Design a protein with these regions (language model features):
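Thiamine diphosphate
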Residues: 1-152, 274-293, 297-301, 363-525
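Long, well-ordered, tryptophan-enriched scaffold segments
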Residues: 3, 188-404
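Conserved alpha/beta enzyme-core scaffolds, especially Rossmann-like or related mixed alpha/beta domains
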Residues: 33-37, 46-49, 153-157, 184-188, ...
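Short beta-strand segments
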Residues: 73, 99, 156-157, 183-187, ...
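Short glycine-/polar-rich loops that comprise or flank the Walker A/P-loop
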Residues: 151, 178-182, 214, 501-502
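A short alpha/beta connector and helix-capping loop motif
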Residues: 164-189, 520-523
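Conserved strand-to-helix beginnings and helix N-cap segments that scaffold or border functional pockets
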Residues: 164-168, 196-199, 516-517
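Anion (oxyanion) recognition and catalysis
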Residues: 175-176, 210, 310, 496, ...
Length: 525
């Protein structure tokens, strides 16, 4: 009997190597072949792209459906474009335009890239948070306008992005709690721009996520290593790997097989030496570098496990190799490194391509071509419209016999809008714990505060009716200007990401506006 699952993942293995080739070659062409008048390095991130090839292959070519939305790690833009090209969503002519005017952008852009980008990324930390607030927006839309087809909101996160404070502000906010359709996949390659990160902060980060109510999966080992752990001596092997410093383990990736044996077994217990005594250098090197973030089946299983968590967000820490599959793998200075022309030639031969067919898609009748075409159909989305067929009043009937502040006028206008039956359903307000002091109180009295579930009001206030339930139209945030602008951006994009146009209005005091502008820019860029 043919194992269809094994056959499918074998095909995906083949596809991911073509994805890696195209991503690396796009960057190589931009730097070495495209006319360059001033001779300045164009740049690109071949190593950072390589580390996410497996997880993006498993996502786009196996796991996602057409309603899902994904934020792609900024430096992985070439991988995204390679996958879109193989699925037929990007014309071949664009592959040689990376980082050129009018061409493929350095980082995914909703407005400037020709292929279907869901979230603009680039300013680290904002990409992961955007899908989180998009999911909060979908929850609001479903409560007010009826359930849409189920959608998952996913972010590919660079591990260094977890140094950004806005990440932790976003996951801790009450407005983002209980979102079971959110999954973050952390590219846990343990390297930053400048260095191999000393130590591993996974325990600290895991604690933060779990404290915020998230489901956490640590995908550290691939199938081969997990199988080895079950063999005699496997416990000693696992303990040795777990106890090894991050710096020592990272140093294995760029070594020849014989050097891997020597470095890995340095000061190792006798039981570990015995475990590898009957294994040649190539087998050993292949085994000890078998990380979960490059095991397509393990990734697919982890994604399914996250889907089963219906009442809380999930994060997968996928251990990867920065520069996976490339000569620069694991090099502490590989962040902006580029393969040499000779290495590109070697890579081309390794993936069985020539200069004549190096940019080709798979043949339509091949197993790989069939998968790519099928996935294009699965992921296809019809266009949506931002148009709202309503008439916005040009003025409201506010009269005053004495001067009033602009803030008071704003509050009175909002109350009048709440009386407009055609306009009111689409208006949603939000504020970072300053709703009443910015004169949203009158509006809130009329429309209520949004909560996924009805909440009992324990203390009656004769002036302010803080009534919380699924039909409320004000979303209250904690004191975080970054969260305010992230949410406003996703509410504004709800016409595309949730199929429902909204009219979002946010309030904050002017000294704090600048703190959130970066998030606002990336919502409209």
């Amino acid at each position: 009997m043919i194992d269809e699952s094994a056959e499918e993942f074998s095909t995906l293995e083949s596809i991911q190597h073509r994805v890696l080739w195209l991503a690396v070659r796009m960057i190589d062409h931009a730097n070495n072949e495209r006319p360059n008048v001033d001779g300045v390095k164009v740049g690109g991130h071949q190593a950072s792209s390589a580390s996410v090839v497996s997880m993006m292959t498993a996502l786009f070519l196996h796991h996602l459906n057409g309603h899902d939305r994904v934020a792609v790690k900024p430096h992985a833009a070439p991988v995204f474009h390679a996958i879109q090209y193989l699925m037929g969503n990007l014309d071949r002519s664009y592959l040689t335009t990376l980082r050129s005017k009018g061409g493929l952008q350095s980082y995914p852009s909703r407005t400037k890239d020709p292929d279907p980008v869901d979230f603009s990324t680039g300013s680290v930390g904002l990409g992961p948070a955007a899908p989180l607030f998009a999911a909060a927006t979908r929850r609001y839309v479903d409560a007010h306008f009826g359930d849409r087809p189920p959608a998952r909101y996913i972010a590919m996160v660079g591990d260094a992005e977890l140094d950004e404070g806005n990440i932790w502000e976003a996951i801790a906010d009450p407005a983002t709690q209980g979102l079971g359709n959110v999954m973050w996949v952390v590219d846990f390659n343990r390297q930053s721009l400048d260095r191999v990160v000393p130590g591993v902060r996974l325990e600290q980060w895991t604690g933060h996520f779990e404290s915020a109510g998230w489901h956490v999966i640590e995908l550290k080992y691939g199938k081969k290593l997990r199988g080895a752990f079950a063999m005699p001596g496997g416990d000693a092997l696992r303990s040795w790997i777990d106890e090894m410093s991050n710096e020592q383990y990272q140093s294995l990736f760029g070594l020849a097989p014989a050097e891997v044996r020597q470095r890995f077994l340095e000061n190792a217990p006798e039981a570990v030496h015995q475990f590898f005594s009957d294994m040649d250098d190539h087998q050993m090197a292949d085994l000890v570098k078998d990380l979960g973030g490059h095991d397509l089946e393990s990734l697919a299983d982890a994604f399914v496990a996250c889907d089963k968590e219906g009442d809380r967000p999930s994060v997968v820490f996928a251990y990867t190799i920065k520069g996976w599959g490339l000569p620069m793998a694991g090099n502490p200075r590989n962040h902006s490194a580029l393969l040499t022309p000779e290495q590109i030639d070697d890579f081309r031969r390794a993936v069985n391509l020539t200069q004549e067919d190096e940019w080709d898609r798979f043949d339509a009748g091949s197993a790989e071509g069939i998968v790519c075409n099928e996935r294009r159909e699965v992921l296809h989305r019809p266009p949506t419209s931002a148009h709202l067929d309503i008439e916005v009043p040009s003025q409201v009937g506010i009269r005053s016999t004495k001067p009033m502040s602009t803030q008071e006028a704003f509050g009175r206008i909002m109350v009048e809008l709440a009386r407009d039956d055609s306009l009111r359903p689409y208006v949603v307000t939000t504020a970072p714990d300053v709703a009443t002091s910015t004169n949203l109180g009158g509006f809130i009295n009329k429309v209520g505060v949004f909560s996924p579930v009805e909440k009992r009001l324990w203390s009656e206030d004769p002036v302010m009716k803080w009534s919380e339930g699924p039909q409320g139209q004000h979303i209250e945030l904690g004191i975080s200007e970054m969260n305010l602008f992230l949410l406003l951006g996703q509410l504004g994009l709800s016409w595309d990401l949730s199929g429902q146009p909204l009219i979002p209005i946010g309030t904050v005091y002017d000294p704090f506006v600048l703190r959130g502008l970066d998030a606002f820019i990336y919502s409209v860029y």
